[in-house]
Amino acid sequence: DQQLLAGLGIASAVLQTIVGLMVFLAYSTTPAVARRFGAGEHTGAVRAGIDGLWLALALGTVLAVVGSLTTPWLVSLFGADAAVSEQAVIYLQLSMWGLPAMLIVFAATGLLRGMQDTVTPLWIAGLGFGLNALLNWLFIYGFGWGIAGSAAGTVVAQWAMVGAYAFVVGQLARRHEASVLPQREGLRGSARAGWWLFLRTVSLRIALLATVGVATGIGTGE
């Protein structure tokens, strides 16, 4: 109904903002890996990508915890009525636990692209989307979970994609004898590389959120 769709719209706006701000994990990891791969430093290339994965996990965990605790406040910023806000909070609180997975997927995609492998990310994305659709159908209609089922299905699919990437990256690490432990300098390098892209995305998301806020103020009756 209208309340469900409106709540989903609010929750999606918040999630897309958070994920969009973190897109630098893919676009900073790719060149870092590609530079080393092109120079023949395959171990260093995999190492750089793994540092990106650890950064993604750290950022995602912090965002998931903070986001889950502040979900009611975030939703209240849109000024929606109680029924719409309730649906938005349900969806958003569950979806927050998929954030670490989504950010890891970004970084893993960057790693594989830097290693000149664009096929594996395509397969994982396709299978992940298919699993997401199947789980959404099962949880929403089979179990009758409503909007919570939609969020739960997406979170499970996201972590399944992480499992697939973990297997692929583990194979790469063994093949090129790269450590899977995080390195401080590598984490700092990944963060520095994405700073300007982060600022660009902040500006774009502020404009989008302002638009959603105005639309929410109009209400579902218009």
PLM segments and residue spans:
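Hydrophobic alpha-helical transmembrane segments of multi-pass membrane proteins
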Residues: T17-L21, S95-W97, W123-G126, F198-V202
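Residue-level signal for transmembrane alpha-helical positions in Major Facilitator Superfamily
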Residues: L25-A26, V66-T70, P100, I104, ...
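Transmembrane helical elements of multi-pass membrane transporters/channels
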Residues: L94, V105, G128, A157-M161, ...
